[in-house]
Amino acid sequence: MRKKWEIEEEYRNFCRNNKELALQTLRELTLTPTETGKEDQRIAYCMEWMKQQGMESVHTDELGNVIWEYRPEQEKKVLYTAHLDTVFSLEEPLEIKEDGMIWRCPGITDDTVNVVMLLMAAKYVHETEPELPCGLIFAADLGEEGLGNLCGVRALVDHYEKNLCGMAAFDLYRDKMYPICIGSVRYRISAKTKGGHSFLNFGRKNAIAELAGLIGELYRFQTDAASHTTYNVGKIEGGTSVNTIAQDASMLFEFRSEDYRSLEACETYLEQTIAARQSEEVQYSCELVGKRPCARETDPVQMARMTRCAQKTLKAADGEEPVCSEASTDCNIPLSRHIPAICVGFCRGGGAHTREEWLDAASVEDGMCAAAALVCRLPWMCCESRVVVRDGIEDRKEKEEIRRLLELCDQDFVPPLSHRNSTSQTNWAETEEKTDGIAEYLENICSQHVVLWKEEGVVRAFMTWKDHFNCENLEAYPDSCYLTTLCVWPDYRGQGISEVIYAEAEKDIAAKFPGSRITLRTWSTNGTQEHILDKLGYSLVRRLKDDRGEGIDTVYFVKKEENDR
């Protein structure tokens, strides 16, 4: 029987049979010149390549994005992108230097090899025609680098936005993935003065000095450390000669942040600072040259499921799970419009944006397997879902769905839920099988607070909790909010859903019972739950040895607070 995330043999066979094609495509595409805004040669290459592989419906949009759709008649779609531009110019000398399986060439990993992964994944889908819950869009897009301003993915999302249920950008390296995006705002700021001779007109305002003064003020801005907000002057120009009071000077300046509110605060500070410095002697202008938006609120469960799916698929391909990080990528655009999106790289390499850029070509085959598997798995993580918070369970349909979930999960608990008297039972010797123990347990939790997770309207996971809870085993934490039951449909486990439900419950508790401690208990052989609790910042505060049978302890946890030692 296949393990949950294992790479199926059909993916492996495809990649073995097409490895040489992938490497040859990589060589040819790497040596095809490209530049942001001048991607024409690579556009032509990808169009011809896809047609040769039988994807006759491949086309370009008005901007030049190369697009092939699988099952275009489907209303819902998942978008996959990889960018055709690099940071280098068309005149950059391109030569692949092969040292065994280490290949060196400008642009080979950012993002050429990921374009090849996109092409090969599209070829796999075209040839195997998998059954999926939605259509797929494969797009080799434009303008990702520098001041390209993400123009390619902007055009794609503008066109498909109402149909998109998720997106993945193929970019960067194998060791990390990026479910968090960094937004940026980039300006060309200029200062103009009357200027003059450095000796004869000494005392007049100097545009360079005034610009330096502005930089000093901008660098005094207090950023929000929690949102990873930064600023930078990247280039300064101006002046005429050593004996001239500069009439003009300009600089390129940017703010970056992962939080849109922080980025808006930066923009406001810049506008106010420049306005305060304007005078008859010094005129400032501020031109917006690039803007990459931050993420807005997106479905947290969908984001968690997509992230976990990518991590586990990549790990199954070659044994290493990528670490989650943050970056500015194609994903900025969908995330800014509430569309779940992740950025994933498939091959090992380094030296991005340098002439020493390198690729471990030995990682191409495993990367191809991961890419082919991921494009077929992610759509199942992108179904419409939502988190619902209630102060009790009254809806008949929800009750029926929760009962079904309890029945499925019953034997996963120690002791089974159907044998229990209540959610706060402490005498486990009194547990016994009942005629309809699930109905009794359901009735017990119906009056509790509940967080439901629904996929396409059906409850697939839930957590219940009590307020003002007291028991002798938690006497150090009186009137706590006590998490009683967490159930996740078996087919949906291991996808990050539990962590999101915990977060939603904690948010609900903080809003309704500020200052209350959060407590819970489980059993000592429930390793999966204990791993989640450790990850989410819960501390073990009491252990009752052999409380639920020989070798099975009852363990109590409390959510850590900042002042906890």
Protein language model regions, located:
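Metal-dependent amide/peptide-bond hydrolase catalytic core
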Residues: 1-10, 179, 200-384
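A non-catalytic alpha/beta surface segment that caps or lines the substrate-entry region
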Residues: 25-28, 34-76, 97
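Active-site metal-coordination/substrate-binding segment of hydrolases
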Residues: 75-137
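Acidic/histidine-rich catalytic neighborhood of metal-dependent amide-processing enzymes
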Residues: 111-182, 254
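Acetyl-CoA-dependent GNAT
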Residues: 391-396, 400, 404-491, 508
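Conserved beta-strand-loop-alpha-helix junction that forms the acyl-donor binding cleft
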Residues: 493, 519-530, 547-549
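Conserved active-site alpha-helix within GNAT-family acetyltransferase domains
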Residues: 499, 524-543
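Conserved GNAT acetyl-CoA-binding A-motif
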Residues: 509-522
